[in-house]
Amino acid sequence: MPALLLCSIVALTTSFYIRGVIEIWIGSFELNDDIALALYSPYDWYTMRWSFSILFGVIISFPLLCLGFYRFMESGLLSTEKRSIRSLFLVISFIIPMGVSIIVALNPIVASAVASSDRIEGVVTKIDPISIVEFSLSASWVFTVFTLLVCTLTTTRILISDDEIGASIRVRFHLIFAALLFVAMSNDFRGLRAIIIFASAVVSDALSKRLAQLFFGIYRG
């Protein structure tokens, strides 16, 4: 609850000052003389403004969210499990904000490079920042959901030793996070949704197995 409240407060506060951040972000587009930015309507501007505000709120409040989850679970954990999950949550709480920041920072550079390398002579190329924002947000949420899935599966493997019960629970988590991934992806990912969801399931399952062995093995032995 405190994390959600902090996210809301940060998003609301940031919305009043986000214009400067957006100007810096737009300035990161490396444009040639024959490439321009296009913003189609006031609605697009407000969409961009609030999208940035909400994303910034999530980045700021995510470590607090991880702390809240850990405190909720702490009373029912053994000492070895506490150390393992505390280390896992600590890593995750920094990976997601860093990953989202990198995705948002790199997208304008990549978009500018693509627009510069693939254009028709005599035709002015226009980059739509709204599409870049939508792609950035979708990519950020895909990364966030994937990382949370890895964290959830790793936690399940650490806490549940019974393979049959653990496998059943992990399948349910896969289905839940597959639905979240489907919703998180914008139309820019049309045609890739099934591939991304399947790849996320396979990679997250393998990665969670290795992480559970790593974190639990360190503190157990």
Where are these regions (language model features)?
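Membrane topogenic/interface segments and analogous intrinsically disordered interaction regions
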Residues: M1-G221
